[in-house]
């Protein structure tokens, strides 16, 4: 079979034999690809560090029966150094990579939008453009939108009556009106659903002065909605740093909190 080339984000890797690794890639045109990088663990490997997680690469592969084989790699963006040097950035980026792999779903299905979104999120984290928690929550909302799982925010999830509505129910699909509100729905504080809408739409100006309590509530709803659709928890989300250490570079000193809200 013929060689093929694609742009990819390295999601994870694990050892294979004495000198090789299996790498999981999120590619633009071929979706999830699992491939063998031969000799990558040797000191003089031709691949160097270009197949480490968080790398954005141009990769050439040889199709295999079960696993493809990496034949060439060129670095496009080296995010890893800026990400792994800080625990908060590292755990946030790990949650993004795990989410990308879970949402990408079947192997070989094109994932142009998800690839673009993932590269943008990693770049924003590495460059410390904004609060890491906001970058992560915006990524999760937009990734769910790509997958067709985005929570309804501006209308009722059940009857589509225009909002704003104050109640939210994960299993119902998001915000719900007073007529459709099921048992167990929560009523988040004023501003929480508005924050979620701003993150989804990229209205960053609307997120600048949002209190930490509202961020906490929004993060909890976003994580719950995502994990309900995935049908099991993400391993990396509980490790994400939240609060003061996460926001110090943005002049905010906030109490630490859990990823699930």
UniProtKB/Swiss-Prot annotation:
One of its GO terms (biological process) is double-strand break repair. The keyword Transmembrane does not apply. It comes from the Bacteria. GO terms for cellular component: bacterial nucleoid. InterPro entries: ARFGAP/RecO, DNA_rep/recomb_RecO_N, NA-bd_OB-fold, RecO, RecO_C. The keyword Zinc does not apply. Keywords: DNA damage, DNA recombination, DNA repair. Involved in DNA repair and RecF pathway recombination. HAMAP family: RecO. Belongs to the RecO family. NCBIfam families: reco. This is DNA repair protein RecO. It comes from Mycobacteroides abscessus (strain ATCC 19977 / DSM 44196 / CCUG 20993 / CIP 104536 / JCM 13569 / NCTC 13031 / TMC 1543 / L948) (Mycobacterium abscessus). The lineage of its organism: Bacteria, Bacillati, Actinomycetota, Actinomycetes, Mycobacteriales.
